[in-house]
């Protein structure tokens, strides 16, 4: 994108969304492909096998990922969004990344594909003190989540929120959806009540 902007001397035409200049978020891919089997995702392991003929994810070397972040941080005041859960390739991959990125002070958005415990969040926060977190359980209802390919519990979601808040997360985004497999109107409305419970507990 940077080359194209310089070549054409035109930044606005390459802006990824309206008002991007006010919030110049940039992304860095941790991997091509995925280990997860989320039924609604076009980038799932199933989709990778059947659409891209990719049998397993190809992970960016963590040192290169850290280098990308530093380069992006030098160009933009906005956050860098690390697309993909750093733990997909295992904890050693995540720790190599944390060592390589140590000292980076810019805003970073990380995402979880499954719950994270306090120990992991302490390692992450030590390396990335200015971090934002995103987690998409999609439903409060474990039955609906299982039908969408997510097998963790509500306790796991709540442990993740607590661990992030206790380690200084700047913002925690939790995403829920409607129109999911096995989801009823009643279940969707119960998700709203679950959100109220979370706000009462963690706000």
Regions found by a protein language model. Give the residues of each.
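Glycine-rich beta-alpha loop elements in corrinoid/cobalamin-binding modules
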Residues: 1-4
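Radical SAM [4Fe-4S] cluster-binding motif and immediate context
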Residues: 6-170, 178
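Structural recognition of alpha->loop->beta junctions
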Residues: 127-135, 194-203
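Metabolite-binding pocket within alpha/beta catalytic cores that recognizes anionic/polar moieties
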Residues: 175
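Catalytic cores of alpha/beta
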Residues: 182-196
């Amino acid at each position: 994108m940077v080359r194209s902007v310089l070549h054409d001397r035109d930044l606005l035409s390459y802006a990824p969304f309206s008002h991007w200049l006010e919030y110049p978020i940039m992304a860095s891919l941790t991997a091509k492909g995925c280990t997860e089997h989320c039924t609604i995702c076009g980038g799932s392991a199933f989709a990778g096998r059947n659409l891209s003929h990719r049998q397993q994810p190809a992970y960016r070397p963590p040192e290169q990922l850290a280098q990308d972040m530093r380069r992006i941080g030098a160009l933009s005041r906005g956050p860098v969004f690390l697309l993909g859960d750093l733990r997909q390739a295992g904890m050693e991959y995540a720790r190599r990344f944390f060592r390589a990125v140590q000292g980076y002070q810019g805003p970073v958005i990380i995402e979880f594909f499954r719950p994270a415990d306090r120990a992991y969040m302490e390692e992450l926060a030590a390396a990335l003190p200015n971090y934002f977190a995103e987690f998409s359980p999609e439903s409060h209802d474990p039955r609906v989540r299982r039908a969408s390919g997510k097998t963790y519990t509500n306790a796991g979601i709540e442990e993740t929120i607590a661990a992030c808040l206790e380690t200084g997360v700047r913002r925690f985004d939790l995403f829920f959806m409607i129109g999911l497999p096995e989801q009823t109107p009643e279940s969707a409305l119960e998700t709203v009540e679950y959100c109220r419970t979370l706000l009462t507990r963690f706000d």
